[in-house]
């Protein structure tokens, strides 16, 4: 089976830089995959992407050096299994708040006896190789999103779930639930404390600590804080930012420092 290079990168104590796709286009997925990202994630939760589009995007990413990942819309086992069959080498699952939810998520990603994933890898065989089913349980990456107060309370139990590789903070939802305002770069004391705790517990339990960021600068700061899996904005945010900068430069204006959210 084709190895999951993200696990090698993390084992060498190098951070994973992850691209993020919300635009339903295999062409833009291919472009992003060629930019040097370690991984590129197809977003089925907040991205404007259906399964048919996701399939072609995963095919496009597979032609690059980036590892193809998917954020599923929810923790429904059928959806998780389907994106894995389509060739995703990892799943980011939103709104995980308990150890029980984590176990169900991980189980859907693993073939028996470690889990309940149904056999039918389809494109997984094409991308992963003929021995896919023998090694998929080891290679497929599992990240549970921490974005609720309940998830923070149950963080230790979530991280102790057998087969879970780590967690990925959804900062907008986490900020919304903790402070009443959605802000990926919130400096509210409760938000800062929550982020510090996630990093600390992941380090102690040797798990991946991931987070969505609004820019490369913000991603670098998160790495300095101890995160080892960062997403420096999504394609919508990057396209908008590049366009605003180009327009400002053409008009001789100051480059804007803020803009619309990627969602």
Please report, for each region that a protein language model flagged, where it lies by residue:
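Expand to "…catalyze enediolate/carbanion chemistry for C-C bond making/breaking, isomerization
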Residues: 1-263
């Amino acid at each position: 089976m084709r190895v999951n290079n993200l696990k090698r990168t993390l084992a060498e104590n190098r951070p994973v830089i992850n691209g993020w796709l919300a635009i339903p286009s295999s062409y833009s997925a291919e472009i992003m995959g060629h930019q040097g990202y370690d991984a590129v994630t197809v977003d089925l939760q907040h991205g404007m992407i259906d399964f048919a589009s996701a399939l072609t995007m995963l095919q496009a990413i597979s032609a690059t050096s980036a590892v193809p990942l998917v954020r599923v819309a929810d923790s429904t086992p059928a959806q998780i299994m389907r994106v894995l069959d389509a060739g995703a080498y990892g799943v980011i699952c939103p709104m995980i708040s308990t150890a029980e939810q984590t176990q169900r998520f991980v189980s859907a990603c693993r073939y028996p006896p470690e889990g309940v994933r149904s056999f039918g890898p389809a494109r997984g065989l094409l991308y992963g190789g003929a021995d896919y089913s023998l090694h998929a349980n080891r290679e497929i990456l599992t990240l549970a999103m921490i974005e609720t107060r309940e998830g923070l309370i149950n963080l230790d139990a979530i991280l102790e779930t057998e087969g879970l590789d780590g967690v990925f903070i959804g900062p907008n939802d986490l900020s919304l639930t903790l402070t009443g305002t959605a802000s990926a770069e919130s400096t509210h004391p409760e938000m800062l404390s929550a982020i510090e705790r996630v990093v600390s517990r992941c380090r102690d339990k040797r798990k991946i600590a991931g987070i969505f960021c609004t820019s490369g600068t913000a991603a670098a700061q998160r790495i300095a804080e101890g995160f080892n899996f960062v997403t420096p904005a999504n394609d919508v945010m990057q396209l908008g930012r590049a366009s605003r900068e180009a327009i400002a430069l053409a008009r001789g204006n100051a480059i804007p420092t803020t803009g619309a959210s990627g969602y």
